Structures are given as C-alpha cells and as structure tokens.
Amino acid sequence: MSRKYFGTDGIRGRVGESPITPDFVLRLGYAAGRVLAHGGEAHGHGRPTVLIGKDTRLSGYMLEAALEAGFTAAGVDVLMSGPLPTPGVAYLTRALRLSAGVVISASHNPYYDNGIKFFSATGDKLPDETELQIEAELEKPMAYAASDALGRARRIEDAAGRYIEFCKSTFPSDLNLFGMKVVLDSAHGAAYHIAPHVFHELGADVVSIGNQPNGRNINDGYGATAPGKLVEATREHGADIGLAFDGDADRLQVVDRNGRLYNGDELLYVMVQARRAAGQTVPGAVGTLMTNLAVELALKAQGVEFVRAKVGDRYVLEELKKNGWLLGGEGSGHLLCLDKHSTGDGIISALQVLAALRRSGQTLDEMLDGVRLFPQKLINVRVEKGFDWKSHAGLQAALKTSEAELDGKGRVLIRPSGTEPVVRVMVEAQDAELANQHAERLAATLQ
C-alpha cells in the first residue's frame, strides 16, 4: 500500500502549507498516540510515553505545541527535550525506555521548511507498517481520551547532558583530543550547544562557528551542505581539522588543515580501514547507488564486500541489518556505525574519524592513500511528467554503448528524480573528460 503522507524520512514540507500545519500536526500526534496506545507500546509504563525533540527552526515551537496536544489528547504522556540532534532523540528514546521518539526538523532544508519523523522504542525509524497504521488513523475522526485518561507533558532539563555523555562514551577510553585544534560548524542547528561540549570535554581546543541560531538562519551558508565557511575558518585558525554538521546533526563533512573537503564516501572508507587496522573483521560495508566507484573498488581489493542500497540512510540501514554488517554511509555524510548507535549520527561519526587519526598517527589524506575519487559528471534532463526512460530506445542504445566502453573504468547511473520531472544522468570514470563525454552523449538522447 502506498503512503499518503510519509516519505523516506518522515513527513516534510513548507511550514503553513499542507501537511506542515498546526491542525494537521495535532491530528498526526493524536493518530500516532492512538497507534501507540493500542499497539502494546507502553513498555512497562502505566501509559505510553513519547519524547519530542526539535532543531532550531522558529516553527518548531508551534509544531511542538501541536504534537503535544495531539499526543496528550490520545492519552499519551509527553517528554520534551527542546533543541536536540535527531540521533540524540533516538538515543534518549531507547535509554529512557520510551514508547517512541519524535523529531521536529527538516534536516538540511531552509528554515521555512519543517518536518516530523518518528523513532521506535529501540531508536530505529518506524517500520512501514507502523507508518501505514498512523496514516489509517489519520483518516478517522478524533475521539479524545476521557478527562482522567489524558496524557501529561513535561520538559526534561538534562536531555543535552545525557546525550553529550553518550557521544563521549563512543570515543575510545584510552584516547583523547589534547593538542588537537578543531573547528566545529553546527549550521546554527540542533548541535550548536552540544557539539562544542563533546569535543572540548575530550580535550580538543574548539573553535565554534554556525552556533548562534535565531530561528531563521539554520543551514543558511553554514553546515554540512555549505562547507565554505568551515574551509575558511579551518585555515584562518590553523586548525588540525574542521567538522561540519547539518541542521539536525545526523550528517558530517570534514575539512583537513589544508582546506581539502572529505565527503561521506571517503569517511566510510577511513572508518573501515580503522577497524581493519585494529584487527577487527569487516566482512562488508554498505553505500548507495551514488557512492563513488573508487571506494567500492578499493574495498573489494581488500576483501571487503560492498553492497549498494537505494539513496537514503533508511535504505543503507536496511541493507546493513540484512547482511549483519556494521558500517555504511552516503556521500552526503550520513554515516552509520551500528555498534555505536542505531542511527546516523554526525557527532559520533566525527569521533570515529578522529579516533582513527589518533590511533594511526596519520592524516586523512594518508589514510586514503591509493583511493582517489573518480570524477563524476551529473546532468539533469527535464522530461515530461511520467516519462519512462527505460523504454526510450535511443537512451537504451547509448547506455549499452557507454557501459561497454566504460567496463572496469567507470559506470553509468540513470535515475528519475523523486520530486520533479527530471532524469538524472550520472557518469563516473577514471578520467574526467571521459565522464563528461559519456554523460553528454547519454543526456543528448533525451533532449
């Protein structure tokens, strides 16, 4: 059954436009509360209890109040953490033995967007069947709990402190960050008051940028999706490394002292190498359809199996669980270390990278010796709505030719956009000119 409201990462949209309106979000809280109340999710409590966290968007106050009203109307107790990274909500939901966690965030989007996503009692994203149950409940009229059965709501004051200690616990106890200068860019988002404490308390000399949220500046020129300010600050302060998170701090980008930017594909490779250097067996890792071919080839050359999931950390997680592996990620900086956390966590991913550098005594560039990302050429071709690229004879003929010519030297990926009438043509090759040539030839068949 198709989902009406839930996408791959919860429900998201422009604030004030359906479905991100106070009335819908109230009904969403009520519907989710009904599913929890009748789904055996009380976990030992007298009634189900959920945690609501949010990032720093101005609209978070409005949507938090609406969710709180909906949940309590359904007889569900509510804890509110205030601004907290998405992975922090996942952790506290599990640590406090709660029924579910809810995050109010639109991740790396501008402030005028917002969204709602849920975590299960185990800190995982909700399974499809639970989201379908919530959508079914949304279609029913609201029937409020009796006055003596309404839920209660309260704020928890130590949420940030608990999460800070959890993040620090994932860093090896025999290592520290003394003598390391680190620039942190929190995107004026949910990590602004948390990331500096984590790295400072582990011994780093911390310089913070993107840490003055005003409700409207989240992701605006700062953070993982706009690393230019991080590159400048890392050079200006003579820092050893720069770390950028996005608005809800579930993704990471890294800059070295020379201003070179490292994406999630490279960081995944570094984490695999660190495990192998420590004598741990790494049978396989998971990337996505967009993961650079150079990383796949380098891992396979070392006997590490590599599987590509659909784009989205949700699908990376599914493949990791299916294969029983621990490490996965996307070029965008969503990285998963399932023996550290149940979900992608920018701060914890950064700590794993720093631990690898400390343990090895190497720089990132040295750890990536022998791995140079293949040049990529991406062309977006606008097409008619409903266009089926798989049945386009000209494209298929050109695709067959390109795949034969690139065999062992590159790859082609063609996929439709999920949000607009566009077909994305991406070619990777060891040579940039070769990638450009094939991408332009393929795109020309659609124009």
UniProtKB/Swiss-Prot annotation:
Keywords: Isomerase, Magnesium, Metal-binding, Phosphoprotein. Its cofactor is Mg(2+). One of its GO terms (cellular component) is cytosol. Its EC number is 5.4.2.10. Binds 1 Mg(2+) ion per subunit. The modification Phosphoserine is found at residue 107. It comes from the Bacteria. It catalyses: alpha-D-glucosamine 1-phosphate = D-glucosamine 6-phosphate. Activated by phosphorylation. CDD domains: GlmM (cd05802). Mg(2+) binds at residues 107, 246, 248, 250. Pfam families: PGM_PMM_I, PGM_PMM_II, PGM_PMM_III, PGM_PMM_IV. One of its GO terms (biological process) is carbohydrate metabolic process. GO terms for molecular function: magnesium ion binding; phosphoglucosamine mutase activity; phosphomannomutase activity. The keyword Membrane does not apply. Catalyzes the conversion of glucosamine-6-phosphate to glucosamine-1-phosphate. Belongs to the phosphohexose mutase family. HAMAP family: GlmM_B. This is Phosphoglucosamine mutase. It comes from Ralstonia pickettii (strain 12J). The lineage of its organism: Bacteria, Pseudomonadati, Pseudomonadota, Betaproteobacteria, Burkholderiales. The gene is glmM.
